[in-house]
């Protein structure tokens, strides 16, 4: 017999998450409590464009307060609770990179932290980019960093790229392109 959720208590909420305290019924009859974060989901984008040295990806350098450091990562963003996945991808691409894409290819979904959150991330390869900026979030300090895909694949394998969603997005993109 597996654990099952006996009750869920909504503890706190925001526009983009809900914090719950769940009571779990264990197989032996005991109960335990665990925190859980409900999340509407997010998109992860691999904006790819041609360059003289092969395909390059529009990466971001962004400060992440939880880590208290600036990291290199793919553009990504939280969707609204009822927002369409592709509409979210189109919006986030314009907000974070200042570009729109004529072609989006789904690269699958991932659960980035299933031990604490139900957040689901949808990965997209975004191609045929043209400038089309939208204002971004006021609290985001983002630097756009175009980088060769080959270099990013190496960084994903050697540990210099540490953001999990970015590692997965880069490796899935490289695999997708190799299958063409």
Where does each model-flagged region fall?
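Conserved Nudix-box catalytic region and its N-terminal flanking loop in Nudix hydrolases
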Residues: 2, 37, 46, 53-91, ...
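Nudix hydrolase/Nudix homology domain
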Residues: 5-8, 30, 70, 81, ...
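Acidic, metal-coordinating catalytic segment for phosphate/diphosphate chemistry
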Residues: 7-46
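Acidic pyrophosphate-coordinating catalytic loop
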Residues: 10-14, 65, 110-121
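Active-site-adjacent beta-strand/loop module that shapes the phosphate/pyrophosphate-binding cleft
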Residues: 20-28, 113-132
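Short loop segments at secondary-structure junctions
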Residues: 27-28, 49-52, 63, 127-131, ...
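Acidic/glycine-rich phosphate/pyrophosphate-binding loops and surrounding catalytic core
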Residues: 50, 100-113
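Short aromatic/basic micro-patch
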Residues: 73, 123, 146
